[in-house]
Amino acid sequence: MTQKIEQSQRQERVAAWNRRAECDLAAFQNSPKQTYQAEKARDRKLCANLEEAIRRSGLQDGMTVSFHHAFRGGDLTVNMVMDVIAKMGFKNLTLASSSLSDCHAPLVEHIRQGVVTRIYTSGLRGPLAEEISRGLLAEPVQIHSHGGRVHLVQSGELNIDVAFLGVPSCDEFGNANGYTGKACCGSLGYAIVDADNAKQVVMLTEELLPYPHNPASIEQDQVDLIVKVDRVGDAAKIGAGATRMTTNPRELLIARSAADVIVNSGYFKEGFSMQTGTGGASLAVTRFLEDKMRSRDIRADFALGGITATMVDLHEKGLIRKLLDVQSFDSHAAQSLARNPNHIEISANQYANWGSKGASVDRLDVVVLSALEIDTQFNVNVLTGSDGVLRGASGGHCDTAIASALSIIVAPLVRGRIPTLVDNVLTCITPGSSVDILVTDHGIAVNPARPELAERLQEAGIKVVSIEWLRERARLLTGEPQPIEFTDRVVAVVRYRDGSVIDVVHQVKE
């Protein structure tokens, strides 16, 4: 009885304070410990299957679902999730994957059936890209850079309702990384952004490990639901396609020339930083820098971006002090992330977001990037092929080109009978004002806006030609290609890293 009186007096004291303070704070309501523990069961995040996870996530028609592309061409998560979503009858969804590849061809049918009606992505390849280029999707695809995606998410334009994140392993509370388990993909740099910003986060994992699983790239307080599946991705396919290490003699020639350009650019000095983009020649530049770094006793402070086996090798030899990894480009890089303390995982926000308080690209000295096309104004296309069909990705191209002290584009002058250097690119991803040097197998051109670079290279005995001279050389080799015919219909909108529209892609005329 005394206990009830004391409880009543305490409640009256609280109510009196609320009245005096003119506030509306809720009064404490006592409940049994068992009730709390039933509501907060230790295994409450675990779902028996993907259908249960989707149902519990609260997904509804018209919402936005997101995915990451750490597995690149080996991704199995997008198709698996979208197949179940389609069977459950959902319609009119926005699909926001950090990038899409050849392996995502099954999305074509989901678009035809009205399951997916809008897409945000960095890139498109294969049958999906071909069908969209021919007008499959009613609304234009929104193409963004890696940094630009984070900006769209944080600005509120791209609101992620449910993020489905495939990982090799996690514990029953959601702590996960990408380098523990069979499907070792390395950095989860793109997934971290989704985990930070999505209203609901569903973790798909191949393996459940004891709690607490650490280090955790994605942490327990970011994850709502967990479902164990057989496979989330084929890690063996990460280092294929655009991230392969080349043996092509022409690409190696271009890479060697680019390394010479870097050495004599004025930026090759103790403590410099570097990044190489996707594409055979750009990735190969790193291997040619090793001897030059040794002979001049130069070490890089960091390498950034997509990390490769070659960069790991230089790191372990002491030539690159730290690796800042937003995406691991091969199994060696993924495994290095687990064993090397100075191989550091970073999010796409830390990597390249224009609106970030501290994007690593803003500390970058040298970047080497590839191109499908480049024109005489140094504008670069990495999205559409010479036939006008979508077959590439914006990636971090425009993010790094503008932010780095020195941006180098490496590309063959011609590919077969198709010129790489043209009068005007079909699609502009990176504006020419961001590009400093073009290195081809027929010569090197420097942007006239950077005369000091041309002077340094010439003083070192490197021949520099005008981009107009290279364009004429390409014309002599290939002739004038037939112009591509397009319809008036826009199939893709290209967003610059700040969210502005830099170009549009029209439907190819059949």
Swiss-Prot record:
Keyword annotations of the record: Cytoplasm, Lyase, Transferase
Keyword Cytoplasm applies: yes
Subcellular location field: Cytoplasm
EC numbers on record: 4.1.3.6, 2.8.3.10
Gene Ontology MF terms in the entry: citrate (pro-3S)-lyase activity; citrate CoA-transferase activity
GO cellular component term, pick one: cytoplasm
Induction of synthesis: Repressed by H-NS. Part of the citCDEFXG operon.
The keyword Lipid biosynthesis appears for this protein: no
Biological process (GO), any one: acetyl-CoA metabolic process
SUPFAM superfamilies documented for this protein: NagB/RpiA/CoA transferase-like (SSF100950)
Catalytic activity: citrate = oxaloacetate + acetate; citrate + acetyl-CoA = (3S)-citryl-CoA + acetate
Complex formation: Oligomer with a subunit composition of (alpha,beta,gamma)6.
Protein name per Swiss-Prot or TrEMBL: Citrate lyase alpha chain
Main function: Represents a citrate:acetyl-ACP transferase.
